[in-house]
C-alpha cells in the first residue's frame, strides 16, 4: 500500500470516529441529532468508499467538523427568560409537577394546570413556588375548564403574551394484551392523551401565534417503539406524535416552533397506585367473555398486574433529563423538533425504524419483562 493510500485510510478512520462518536453521544444522551449530522455520516462513508484524493478528504473532514461544531453551538443559544409565561398541563405530579417547579426557579411565569386544585400536588406548588406561579384547575377532558383556564391566563399575562404551552397531561393503563383492554379504557386514554392535548392546543394557539412562541407536546418512546401490553396508551402517543409533526409544519409560517418530547422509562405516577390497578383489573375482568375466560384465565390478568412494580423498579427515578430537554425546547433559539430523554431512548427509536421486524419483535419480547402464558397455551403435564 502506498503512503498516500495509507494516509487517506487513516483520515477516513479519524473522520468516521468523530462522526460515529457524535452519533453515539446522541443515542446515549437522548438529544436528537440534527438530520444533517446523520446525513453527513452517511455521505462521509460513501466518500471514503470512493477513495477520494488526500486533498479532497482533508477538505471534507474540515467541512464535517465545522458543521458539527456549528450545529452544537446553535443548540446552546438560549433566549433570555425575562419572566416568559409558560402553561404546563398535568402538573399534579411527575414531569409536569417537576417542570412547574423547575421553570419557576429559573424565573418563568408559570401556569400549572392540575387535575385537582385542592390536591397534594397543587398544594405543594403553592407552598414551595414563587408568586409568579399560578395553579389552575384544568382537567384537559373538560372543555369548560380549559376555557376558564384560558380566561385566567389571558387576564394575568395581558400584553406580556404567552410564550409556551407544554402539553404534559397523560394517563396509562394496566399493561395487558390489547384484546383484553375494555373500550372504556381505550376511550379514556384517547380522551386524555390525545384529544385533551388537541383541545388545549386549539384553545391557546392564538396566544402562541402572537408571541411566536413554543408548543411542546410530551409524547412517549412508546408512541414509536411497539412495546407489548401498551396498545391503548401507545396508540394515543403515536397519534399525538403525528399530530405534533404535522402541526409543526403548519405553524412554521406563523413563527411558532412545535417540539415533541419522547421520554424513555422514568418513574412517575402515570402508572397509578395500587387502588387504581385493582380498579382496572376489576374492569377488565368484568368485560371478560366466555372465550376470553377459557383462553386467558383470570389469573393471567392478576399476573400482569404484578409486573407493574417491576416496571417501576427498572425506570429511572431521576427526571432531570426530561426537565432539561423541555427547558431547552422552550428556551433555545433553534430547538430540535424531537427530544428523546432517557437511557438509550434514541437508540430504541433507531432500532424501531431500521431493525428487521422479526429481530425487533424478538428483542422487545426478551428485553423488557417476562410475559405470562395464557391458560390455553400452558403445557399440560
From Swiss-Prot:
Domain of life: Eukaryota
Keyword Lipid metabolism found: yes
Lineage: Eukaryota, Metazoa, Chordata, Craniata, Vertebrata
Enzyme nomenclature, EC number: 1.1.1.62, 1.1.1.239
Gene3D superfamilies: NAD(P)-binding Rossmann-like Domain
Residues annotated as binding substrate: 220
Gene Ontology CC annotations of this record: endoplasmic reticulum membrane
Main location: endoplasmic reticulum
Cited PROSITE patterns: ADH_SHORT
Gene that this sequence comes from: Hsd17b2
Compartment(s) where it occurs, according to its Swiss-Prot or TrEMBL record: Endoplasmic reticulum membrane
Keyword Oxidoreductase part of the UniProt annotation: yes
Residues engaged in binding NAD(+): 83-112
Function: Catalyzes the NAD-dependent oxidation of highly active 17beta-hydroxysteroids, such as estradiol (E2), testosterone (T), and dihydrotestosterone (DHT), to their less active forms and thus regulates the biological potency of these steroids. Oxidizes estradiol to estrone, testosterone to androstenedione, and dihydrotestosterone to 5alpha-androstan-3,17-dione. Also has 20-alpha-HSD activity.
Biological-process GO terms, alphabetical: androgen metabolic process; estrogen biosynthetic process; in utero embryonic development; placenta development; response to retinoic acid
Designated name of the protein: Estradiol 17-beta-dehydrogenase 2
Residues passing through the membrane, by range: 4-24
UniProt-recorded Gene Ontology molecular function terms: estradiol 17-beta-dehydrogenase [NAD(P)+] activity; testosterone dehydrogenase (NAD+) activity
Membrane association type: Single-pass type II membrane protein
Amino acid at each position: 500500500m502506498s503512503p498516500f493510500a495509507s494516509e487517506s485510510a487513516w483520515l477516513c478512520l479519524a473522520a468516521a470516529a468523530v462522526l460515529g462518536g457524535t452519533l453515539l453521544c446522541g443515542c446515549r444522551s437522548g438529544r436528537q441529532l440534527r438530520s444533517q449530522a446523520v446525513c453527513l455520516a452517511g455521505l462521509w462513508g460513501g466518500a471514503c468508499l470512493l477513495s477520494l484524493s488526500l486533498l479532497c478528504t482533508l477538505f471534507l473532514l474540515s467541512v464535517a467538523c465545522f458543521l458539527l461544531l456549528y450545529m452544537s453551538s446553535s443548540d446552546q443559544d438560549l433566549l433570555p427568560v425575562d419572566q416568559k409565561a409558560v402553561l404546563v398541563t398535568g402538573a399534579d405530579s411527575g414531569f409536569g409537577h417537576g417542570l412547574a417547579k423547575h421553570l419557576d426557579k429559573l424565573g418563568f411565569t408559570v401556569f400549572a394546570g392540575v387535575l385537582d386544585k385542592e390536591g397534594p400536588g397543587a398544594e405543594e406548588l403553592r407552598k414551595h413556588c414563587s408568586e409568579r406561579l399560578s395553579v389552575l384547575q384544568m382537567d384537559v377532558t373538560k372543555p369548560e375548564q380549559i376555557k376558564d383556564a384560558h380566561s385566567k391566563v389571558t387576564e394575568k399575562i395581558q400584553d406580556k403574551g404567552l410564550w409556551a404551552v407544554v402539553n404534559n397531561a397523560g394517563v396509562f393503563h394496566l399493561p395487558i394484551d390489547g384484546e383484553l383492554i375494555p373500550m372504556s379504557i381505550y376511550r379514556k386514554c384517547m380522551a386524555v392523551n390525545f384529544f385533551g392535548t388537541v383541545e388545549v392546543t386549539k384553545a391557546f394557539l392564538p396566544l402562541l401565534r402572537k408571541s411566536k412562541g413554543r408548543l411542546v407536546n410530551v409524547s412517549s418512546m412508546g408512541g414509536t417503539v411497539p412495546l407489548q401490553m401498551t396498545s391503548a396508551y401507545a396508540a394515543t402517543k403515536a397519534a399525538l406524535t403525528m399530530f405534533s409533526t404535522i402541526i409543526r409544519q403548519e405553524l412554521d409560517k406563523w413563527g411558532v416552533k412545535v417540539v415533541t418530547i419522547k421520554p424513555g422509562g422514568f418513574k412517575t405516577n402515570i402508572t397509578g397506585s395500587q387502588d387504581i390497578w385493582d380498579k382496572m383489573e376489576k374492569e377488565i375482568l368484568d368485560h371478560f367473555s366466555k372465550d376470553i375466560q377459557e383462553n386467558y384465565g383470570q389469573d393471567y390478568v392478576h399476573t400482569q398486574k404484578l409486573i407493574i412494580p417491576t416496571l417501576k423498579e427498572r425506570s429511572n427515578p431521576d427526571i432531570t433529563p426530561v426537565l432539561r430537554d423541555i427547558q431547552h425546547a422552550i428556551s433555545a433559539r433553534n430547538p430540535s423538533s424531537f427530544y428523546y430523554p432517557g437511557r438509550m431512548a434514541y437508540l430504541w427509536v433507531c432500532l424501531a425504524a431500521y431493525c428487521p421486524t422479526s429481530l425487533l419483535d424478538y428483542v422487545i419480547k426478551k428485553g423488557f419483562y417476562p410475559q405470562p402464558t395464557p391458560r390455553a397455551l400452558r403445557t399440560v403435564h
